Regions:
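Conserved RecA-like ASCE P-loop NTPase motor core of nucleic-acid helicases/translocases
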Residues: 14-21, 425-426, 504-515, 631-632
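A contiguous, basic/glycine-rich beta-loop/short-helix subdomain that forms a polymer-engagement track
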Residues: 110-141, 154-167, 320, 327, ...
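SF2 helicase catalytic motif II
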Residues: 173-195, 199
């Protein structure tokens, strides 16, 4: 932060600081208060950017207040709390910001006040000029420091890249040119999500809603493209005709109740027929149709019915794309040519709508058409296609055709790193192995794979620094050898270890089901000993609030999944024990198999070492910290532990021995405050 702020001030420029997790973003925001201690200067110089779904939508709030007579009591109280918060909030961040979600009386109500469904009507909204999201976007153009996440940073870079290829100007803002990527080991994952193509039912429903607006009995607020532009194009009959063509074409996309219709084998429209054929091929090639987890299969060899429906769906998309492209060109001409008073009233709305049109007409729909074109063939070089039926707790919730790049950092390097004037990528776990071994070329190769640096014309500069912590003195690593995968034994192990540590324990799981089962089993025993237990996917709080509660109560315990393995900073007494349920192997799905084929047989080990190292990294945050890292998996091979700090002996112990070691180590002199309660 210090070098970034100094450079920004001296050069009157902007530096984007990008993270992967909300937890680290919050920590950086707190640290920036030390860089800019004056609150007024901080507000002027720094912008925190998050996704749309984080900010309170003022129009949603207005509509909820209109429903006061029919709200239940706790929802009425919740709305009053939000109203009080609105008068004091800095940025309107309802999810993980300054809103006290821990005190919220109606879990699940607050997220409904954000725009998670893409219902924003932009310039047509009466609150547009006061909109928290728009205000943050405008402010980021003049800030010295912009704190974002990897996904938003890539969105911004892609938007400017697309604008360079059209007549657009990127909304009048200069593109980001200087970056600091913290949590750089997650660039690969962020790019994998951002540069993927998902032709799924949920995506199709959203595209239809964006064009036609809410339909059926959903009662959702929002206006589609047709309603937003009808008044603007009132004196342009040819453009109104194009708008009508687009609306008619959107009938080929899934509508409300599409999953039920597919289950009943009664699809409507080209895309629903395509999705039903996808579902049929996946089910025909799956061995366990009753699995609670998602099903997937290769596209090739393709079933004739799927191929025929893919061709029909592609033609339907062409019928949407062609008039959409023509409409976008005409709207941009109108923005350049018309300055009359009547059109000036609509200018802001047209600019907002045009951004949405170009995003879909230039990126989304052409990408879908490209993937459908190749459905009977192998995916183009460097990519992998597959069909999937996504499930949650045994119920289908999405179906689609998916295309991912085997190495998504190629696009990241092209769109983000190459145009940049400077990019600094940092992480304590960028390299694969422990420090002495990872000074070799192989160690840095893993870093280049995760960050895309290997795709740059000029090689990236490398720098590594020795940790300031004495891990051999401050920590212990234990592999428990006699805990099976039986749910009761696993729960008993967590219970005994948490009690031995006297709280201050973080339990990490590879599945939500196992987490919930363990929570049910150990909560009574911990409660009897005065050890509060919090858990993701159980407590109705966002991850940031759970971590805050865990941090403040030194004897509490917390259960979580991946989000708590990365980017959580809990120094001091509040975290002295980390327990992994099992070795966090990557899931051997179709995409992972393709990557393992390209990156080599050691790819699985690289990912697993990274995850273990990240979990261990939560434990020691200060020179005065002490803690124990426990892995409840007797089959953990020693090679996977090579990424953990050197000098710390890996002890393979029985559960009883591990419990005794945890208790003894945490009671050693120098950590008296961490001693478990008697």
């Amino acid at each position: 932060l210090a070098p970034a702020s100094l450079w920004a001030e001296r050069n009157e420029g902007t530096v984007w600081i990008s993270t992967y997790t909300k937890n680290l973003q919050r920590q950086i925001a707190q640290e920036l208060r030390r860089v800019y201690p004056d609150p007024a200067v901080l507000a002027e110089k720094v912008t925190i950017r998050k996704g749309r779904e984080n900010y309170l939508c003022l129009l949603n709030f207005e509509e909820q207040t209109g429903r006061l007579p029919v709200l239940i009591e706790r929802e009425t109280v919740a709305l009053g709390l939000v109203a009080r918060w609105l008068m004091a909030t800095k940025d309107g961040d309802l999810i993980g910001g300054d809103f006290p979600s821990w005190a919220f009386p109606a879990p699940g109500f607050a997220p409904g006040l954000t725009d998670k469904q893409g219902e924003c009507i932009y310039g047509a909204c009466p609150h547009y000029r006061r909109c928290f999201l728009e205000r943050v976007g405008r402010k980021s153009r003049t800030s010295r420091i912009v704190v974002s996440n990897h996904a938003l940073t890539m969105v911004e870079a892609a938007r400017h890249a697309a604008a360079r290829g059209t007549d657009g100007d990127g909304n009048g803002a200069s593109p980001p040119l200087r970056y600091v990527f913290d949590e750089g080991h997650h660039i690969f994952d962020a790019a994998d999500s951002f540069y993927a193509i998902h032709i799924s039912g949920r995506e199709g429903v959203e595209l239809r809603r964006w064009i036609r607006g809410p339909e059926g009995r959903s009662g959702r607020r929002g206006r589609g493209l047709v309603e937003r532009l009808t008044a603007v194009l009132d004196d342009a009959p040819q453009e109104l005709e194009r708008l009508n063509e687009i609306a008619q074409g959107a009938l080929a996309l899934p509508g409300e109740g599409w999953l039920n219709r597919l289950s009943s084998e009664a699809p409507r429209g080209a895309m629903e027929k395509f999705l039903m054929a996808v579902r049929a091929q996946v089910r025909a090639r799956s061995e366990d149709l009753h699995s609670p987890y998602g099903l997937e299969c290769e596209v090739v060899p393709v079933m004739p019915e799927l191929l025929a429906n893919a061709i029909a769906f592609k033609h339907a998309l062409d019928a949407i794309r062609e008039p959409l492209v023509a409409l976008a060109l005409r709207l941009r001409e109108m923005l350049r040519e018309r300055s009359d008073e009547v059109f000036s009233q609509h200018r802001m709305r047209v600019e907002a709508v045009l951004r949405g049109i170009e995003r879909r007409a230039v990126l989304q729909i052409p990408n879908w058409i490209m993937a459908l074109d190749a459905i009977g063939e192998q995916a183009p070089g460097g990519h992998v296609d597959w069909l999937s039926v996504e499930r949650f707790e045994g119920h289908d919730y999405d179906i689609g055709l998916y295309r991912h790049a085997i190495d998504p950092t190629v696009s990241f390097a092209l769109e983000v790193l190459e145009p940049a004037h400077g990019a600094f990528i940092t992480s304590a776990t960028l390299r694969d192995r422990a420090p002495k071994e990872s000074e070799t070329v192989d160690g840095w190769r893993a870093a280049e794979i995760r960050t895309g640096a290997g795709h740059l014309v000029m090689p990236a500069q490398r720098a590594s620094f020795v940790s300031p912590f004495d891990y051999a003195r401050q920590s212990r690593i234990i592999v428990v050898t006699d805990v099976s995968r039986d749910a009761d034994m696993l729960s008993a192990a967590y219970r005994d270890l948490f009690i031995a540590a006297g709280g201050g324990a973080l339990g990490l799981f590879t599945s939500v089901r196992s987490l919930r089962a363990t929570h049910r089993a150990i909560a009574p025993a911990l409660s009897q000993r005065g050890l509060p237990l919090y858990a993701q996917h159980v407590d109705g709080l966002d991850t940031g609030s759970l971590v805050d509660l865990f941090r403040e109560d030194e004897n509490s315990c917390l259960l979580g999944t991946d989000a708590l393995r990365d980017g959580v900073d809990v120094p001091g007494r509040s975290l002295r024990l980390v327990v992994f349920e099992r070795v966090p192997w990557p899931r051997p799905d179709i995409l992972h198999k393709a990557r393992r084929s390209q990156f080599g047989r050691g790819y699985d080990d690289q990912l697993t070492r990274l995850r273990l190292a990240q979990g261990f990294g939560r434990l020691i945050r200060r020179a005065s910290d002490r803690g124990v890292f426990v892995l409840l998996d007797a089959r953990a091979p020693s090679r996977l532990l090579a990424g953990l700090p050197q000098g710390v002996e890996v002890q393979r112990l029985s559960l009883a021995e591990a419990v005794a070691e945890v208790r003894a180590f945490l009671q050693q002199p120098g950590l008296a405050d961490n001693r478990p309660p008697q």
